[in-house]
Amino acid sequence: MAALAVLHGVVRRPLLRGLLQEVRCLGRSYASKPTLNDVVIVSATRTPIGSFLGSLASQPATKLGTIAIQGAIEKAGIPKEEVKEVYMGNVIQGGEGQAPTRQATLGAGLPIATPCTTVNKVCASGMKAIMMASQSLMCGHQDVMVAGGMESMSNVPYVMSRGATPYGGVKLEDLIVKDGLTDVYNKIHMGNCAENTAKKLSISREEQDKYAIGSYTRSKEAWDAGKFANEITPITISVKGKPDVVVKEDEEYKRVDFSKVPKLKTVFQKENGTVTAANASTLNDGAAAVVLMTAEAAQRLKVKPLARIAAFADAAVDPIDFPLAPAYAVPKVLKYAGLKKEDIAMWEVNEAFSVVVLANIKMLEIDPQKVNVHGGAVSLGHPIGMSGARIVVHLAHALKQGEFGLASICNGGGGASAVLIEKL
C-alpha cells in the first residue's frame, strides 16, 4: 500500500524520505562512500617491441601478456592474490584460443578465481582497458586491478570463408588487414583514411617524412639516454639447442635508412599520395600492463604510487576521419580535469601514421616540442592492442613529479580514447 501511495503522490514525507534513502543506498551498491575513489598507478611496464616476424615472433600474444602482467605485479611489489581482476586489450584474436586475457592472467600465476576480460577497441584497446579498470576502482567495485594490452601481429593467421569450395579454388584473407586495418564502412585501408586526412588538412608528404625521421631520431636518442630503461620487462626466449636469447630493447627503431625515406613509393594512393612505409607505423609484437589501485589500497599495501589517473574520455567521428578523433577526446579530458592545454607537460599522441600526429597538433594547437618527445609508433612499432597502454606506461615514467601528461590514441571506426595522468 505504501508503494501505491508513493505512485499517487500521497505518501507522508517521513516515509518518502526513508524510501529515497533506501534507493540512494541501492544506487551506491558498488561504492563504500558517496564520492569516487582516487585511482593510482603503482607500477607500469611493457615488453620490448618486436619487429614483424622478428625477435618476438615465437611468442603468442597471450604469452607476451603474461610477461607484462608478471612484470607489472613484480614491480608493484604486491602479492598476486591482491589483484582482484584483470582487463587486457587485444585486437586480432583469431587463432589465439578462448579468452586471451584469461590465458595471460593464469599464465602469470594469478589465482584461478581472478576474473578476466578482453577488451577490443581496435588500436585504443589497451588504453580502454586501463580506463575501464579505473572506472571499476573509482566506484569501489574492486580495489586492485591489472590492465593493459597485448598483440602478436606476427602470429595472426590467414582465414578462408566457410562453405562449399568454389570453382577455381579458395581465397585466403589476412586477418591483420581484415580485422585490424580495414575501414569496414568505406571498404578502404586505414592508410587511405590517413591520405584523406592529409588532403583535408593540407599536410604534405615532405612534412610527414620529416616527422617520421624525427620520430626515429628521438627514439634512438631516448634509448641511448636510458629513457625507456625503467619501463621495460625483458623477455627470455628459449631456442632449441642454443643458449637462451634475452630481448630487452625495441627492435624497430634501428631498422631505418634515412636516405631512402624521401625516395619510397606511396603505399595506399599511387597518384599524389603522401603515406609511405617510412612515415606510417609498422606491424609489431608486444604487451604492456599497469597495476592500478585505489589510494586507500595503496596505503594499506604500503606501496608508493607512480601517478594518479586524473581524467579520461572517448570520442567518435566519421569512420574515415578516425585520425582526427583524438582532437575531440582531448578537450573532453581537459574539461573534466579543469585544466588548459598549457598545463600539460608531455603529450603522447599515438603515431599510427605521421599524419595523425601532425593533424592533431594542428587541430589542438599544441606545442610540437611537447609531443612524443621520445618517439612513437612510427619508429618504436605499433602492436595494435598494446599501443594505447604503452603510451600511458611511458608517461608514468617520463613525467616529473607534479607534472600532467596526456595520452591519446585514435582507433578504426572513427574513435579515440584519451587518458590524463599526474605524476606523484
From Swiss-Prot:
Cysteine pairs bridged by disulfides in the record: none
Q: Which residues carry this modification: N6-acetyllysine?
A: K63, K171, K178, K187, K199, K220, K227, K242, K248, K254, K260, K270, K335
Q: Which UniProt keywords apply?
A: Acetylation, Acyltransferase, Fatty acid metabolism, Lipid metabolism, Metal-binding, Mitochondrion, Phosphoprotein, Potassium, Transferase, Transit peptide
Task: Give, as in the UniProt entry, the pathway in which the protein acts.
Answer: Lipid metabolism; fatty acid beta-oxidation
**Which residues get modified to N6-succinyllysine?**
K63, K75, K171, K178, K187, K199, K220, K227, K240, K242, K260, K263, K265
Location within or outside the cell? Mitochondrion
Q: Where is the transit peptide?
A: 1-30
Annotated site (Increases nucleophilicity of active site Cys), which positions? Answer: H382
Q: How is it modified after translation?
A: Succinylation at Lys-265, adjacent to a coenzyme A binding site. Desuccinylated by SIRT5.
Residues that coordinate or bind K(+) = Y216, A277, A278, A280, V378
The catalysed reaction is:
2 acetyl-CoA = acetoacetyl-CoA + CoA; propanoyl-CoA + acetyl-CoA = 2-methyl-3-oxobutanoyl-CoA + CoA
Give residues where Phosphoserine occurs. S204
Top-rank taxon of the source lineage equals Eukaryota
* Pfam families per UniProt: Thiolase_C, Thiolase_N
User: What EC identifiers does the entry list?
Assistant: 2.3.1.9
Q: Which GO terms describe its molecular function?
A: acetyl-CoA C-acetyltransferase activity; C-acetyltransferase activity; cholesterol O-acyltransferase activity; coenzyme A binding; enzyme binding; identical protein binding; potassium ion binding
User: Got a GO cellular component term for this one?
Assistant: endoplasmic reticulum
* Binding residues annotated for CoA, in chain numbering: Y216, R255, V256, D257, K260, S281
Catalytic residue list: C123, C410
- Give details on activation and inhibition: Activated by potassium ions, but not sodium ions.
Q: Tell me the function of this protein.
A: This is one of the enzymes that catalyzes the last step of the mitochondrial beta-oxidation pathway, an aerobic process breaking down fatty acids into acetyl-CoA. Using free coenzyme A/CoA, catalyzes the thiolytic cleavage of medium- to long-chain 3-oxoacyl-CoAs into acetyl-CoA and a fatty acyl-CoA shortened by two carbon atoms. The activity of the enzyme is reversible and it can also catalyze the condensation of two acetyl-CoA molecules into acetoacetyl-CoA. Thereby, it plays a major role in ketone body metabolism.
Q: Which family does it belong to?
A: Belongs to the thiolase-like superfamily. Thiolase family.
Instruction: Relate the assembly described in the record.
Output: Homotetramer.
Entry protein name: Acetyl-CoA acetyltransferase, mitochondrial
Tell me which species this is from.
Rattus norvegicus (Rat)
Q: Lineage in the entry? A: Eukaryota, Metazoa, Chordata, Craniata, Vertebrata
